[in-house]
Amino acid sequence: MEIAINRLNADKDLEVFHDLDVNYVDTSKTAGPRAARTAALNNATVAAMGLMRDCYIQSTILNINLKIAVSDVCEMDLSSVKGFDQTSVLMNSQTNSLAKSVMYFLDKYQWKKVALVSPSAVLTAFAARVRSDLLDALTANKIDILVDSRLDPMSDITEKVKEDAEKARIFIICDWSSNANLLRNYIFKLGEMNKMQSGEYFVLGYISYDTNYQWLEASSGDQRLVHLGASDINDYNLTENDLHEVYKNVVILSDGPPPAEPNSTWEDIKTQVLKKKPAKMCPPYCNTTISEKITPRWDRIKLLFDSIQYLADATNDALNIGANIYQSDIFYEHLISRKVDSVTGVTEYIDGYGAIVGSMQIYYHFSSSSHNSYSLFPCARLAQSSLLNTVWSLTDYSEGLSIDFVNKSAPKDTPVCGFYGENCGPPANNTFIIVISVGVAVLIGLAIAAAFLYKRYRYERRLHSLFFMIDRNQIILKKHTNLMSQQSLRSMASIHGSVVAASQTLRDSHFFIEDYNNASSINASSIFNTGSTARAGPFGPIPGFGGVTGASEDEKWHQIPDFGVGLYEGRTVALKRIYRSDVEFTRSNRLEIAKLQESVNSNVIEFVGMVVQSPDVFVVYELAQRGSLKDILDNDDMPLDDVFRSQMTKDIIAGLEYLHSSPVGCHGRLKSTNCLIDARWMVRLSSFGLRELRGEETWQQEDDVQEGKDQLWTSPELLRWSTGLSQCGVLLVQKSDVYSLAIVLYELFGRLGPWGDEPMEPREIVSLVKREALAGKKPFRPDMAVLKESPRIVQETVVAAWTEDPLNRPSLHQIKRKLKPLTIGLKRTIMDNMVSMIEKYTDKLEKDIAERNEELEAEKAKSEALLKMMLPEVVADSLKLGSNVSAESFENCTVFFSDCPGFVEMSATSKPIDIVQFLNDLYTVFDRIIDQFDVYKVETIADAYMVASGLPVPNGNHHAGEIASLGLALLKAVESFKIRHLPNEKVRLRIGMNSGPCVAGVVGLKMPRYCLFGDTVNTASRMESNGIPLRINCSGTAKEILDQLGGYEIEERGIVEMKGKGKQMTYFVRGENSDMRRERIIRERVKFASLKKAQIQEKTYEFS
């Protein structure tokens, strides 16, 4: 206690709480100890500490005396007083700490079935509540308690452990006994039965620190541990290695203080306590003999220091804000729901009921040689992470909790087959199982073999049946012109220029395709690579196939040039001639055709079949409606942007990737004329496969100029290959495809043909490509200057892809990854990109429209506000609806006029700008005041201010009262009004009011005004002009209405001669009773809606 008090006196942070002293009261040897304790508690001024375990009576005494009770060992249950005014604070661990810790592990490992083991001895009240809280938590979380054993730790529990082990896998052992005999015995028995070593069992143990602190503290000096000792396993059939395996599936929980950590404060306190230990503890234990061998209760010492520091911090906080600490209900608010910084270095919390939240220490075994082989070491702490976050979490020490399960994973709470084998069938005879298994395996093998043979048979039969052959009578030939006419290409020229142009292009293209599908002729030479023109038939030059009157079917097919178009099974197909008079379909040919028919991908042209009727041989393909990539590149009216080029590049690479991974294996003839464009503007590769059939073609070039033109995209190694493409390996052709891809990219981004502006003839270019490298010269390639405006990654890719050595060329995957920046954000096809562009434009347009609508609404609101400032709201609403606003008669209303006597003289002696500022300031004040009344401001002319009530919305007889109350408010306001340029002058406001019938209506087209007409208006004006400054001159008719309303003080002025009116009896309105007006308005608001805007004044205005 003295050490703790000395620490507080030395704490400079405690600004108003210092110079403490200790008042000890030892009642252990006095007569009537209970009476002495009661007297001591009654003498407490603010708080008392050091209450006993059963502190109910002591806390009650302090509660009755409105004093604070701070206990570090009290075990009473505050649940019975929660919700009532109380003054008790409990600093020891709570009974639900074990339940929260156990639920942490059960939730973490999803254990839903457990066994609960505890001593059979009578429990203390505190231990009983701990067990009760644990049972409640297990029930609330739907945890099945398979076993609930209450055992004598000193008896033989072998049979009971064996019985429990057959019913459960996860054990919760709560041991409140000294030396934890039940926990040791139970764990070692499970180990002796080889249950723990199997990894299927787990023990979550609890040791009461209160009954085991001596051996827990004495085990290892500063580093407290759970020491089970070598001698403990002598009576069991266990080795040290067995013990290590057992410990892997054991976690121990304890409610003691944290173990020693590198905490200078706690270490200093321990040193001071140990130095003081041999001395006689007087005070306070002057009548008691203290053993020098007693083990210090570090948990009690920790709680004592924490309690004193906690009470000091709370008192200091209360005094700093001026709180009265002698008033317990106020001081108690500073004690609850606050953080407690323990001297051990951890953080704890006091809840809203004055009880500490508590925590739980975790012990686990480590196999490190630096640790005792028989001990479990403190590795973590379970506690609440903050005052508001009630979920418990781990606070790691230097070791940290890492459970090394026997089987490397947490055991299941239920065996695979259940505890009684209910989840598995009965055991079967092994011989029978083996025979059945072998039989089933043989049958499955035979079935697989039969299925394979049947599939093979069907495949061979299909190959033999020439499934791909098409009877030419099933194809209807069509005339052809130019598929992609100049007009169509021009309509596509602005495909990426703007969204509007793109939309128009879609409509144009759709119309063209429909025309074509209906009947228009078509030029198939724009679909596949060309090499010759239409041949002359027996009837002379043929302008188009199928167009010669009287020609036979054979003649029509024989007159088809390199390419044709027809209708097959309801769809348009392309016909490509193979220059062979006949074809003998060998097995290898049929296999190659089968691979072609299996190659289906969105980036390759579909193979439909073949037409073979000597001497004509055609391959039937799916038709690409928009021609080839070369057609587009050769058309100067077709602008190409980066999106177009990037999408085309993406499609070409995707098609090649598919072919290289498909049974076809390669392309072999990649060029821009074989990159076809379909209706969705997607590139689809054609003219691949059939290498053996096409390798034997016999047609010749038309002239020398065209010779070598089809070989401008071919790689050097294939040009040198004398045996033809059909004899090349797939890998070599794949590398050749990479070279051809480079030429296509050069053509696509340069747009000057496959070899740019090279002036040589194609056959000369092919010859140089084929021979230059062999002669030791630099390989001949297109001029890279053509691509100077292209992206750098494209230039680098082209150069790498047309490298002379095929093995040094990049793979398609590498090329795709290199060019990925070009395709980021692109859709699947160009058409999808166009749709995306339209959608973005639409979204932007909708956003712009919404913004314009918001601006329009804002301006509309301003216009309406301005209109309502010029005209009454009901009149303005009628005008907005287009209704005619006719003049309206009002049976009764009150008109108000006011002016400022002396205004003319002021105007003569003041600057015009000063007069303007004066009137603006005055009327601004007036306008703010009239908003509080059910009145309408008609107009202002110079210093004259005109207001009316009872129109345009009638309000019964309240119009006279609203005008009178307004006049009183204005007179009150001018008392404090300052004239800027004449600060010493006062505004002497003169007011006149009159009630009676009136006619009102809108007058004029330009700057229309709501005007009032009638004798009532004239009389009100005379009342104002014949009035007295700072007075409200009231007519007799207005006075009668005010008398009916009540609450107004009216003084008779007398008869006044008025111009045009003769003699009139007049009155002064002197004041009002605001309570009567309030009651009147509240009562009549439902009847007269216009009264809702009238604000009730809290003051009564009176003038003498």
From Swiss-Prot:
One of its GO terms (molecular function) is ATP binding. Residues 838-871 form a coiled coil. ATP binds at residues 534-542, 576. PROSITE patterns: GUANYLATE_CYCLASE_1, GUANYLATE_CYCLASE_2, PROTEIN_KINASE_DOM. The chain crosses the membrane at residues 432-452. Keywords: ATP-binding, Cell membrane, cGMP biosynthesis, Coiled coil, Glycoprotein, Lyase, Membrane, Nucleotide-binding, Receptor, Transmembrane, Transmembrane helix. It is a single-pass type I membrane protein. GO terms for biological process: cGMP biosynthetic process; intracellular signal transduction; receptor guanylyl cyclase signaling pathway. Residues 894-1024 form the Guanylate cyclase domain. It is an enzyme of class 4 (lyase). Residues 1-431 are extracellular. Its main location: membrane. Glycans are attached at residues 43, 237, 263, 287, 407, 429. Residues 453-1104 are cytoplasmic. It is found in: Cell membrane. This is Receptor-type guanylate cyclase gcy-15. It comes from Caenorhabditis elegans.
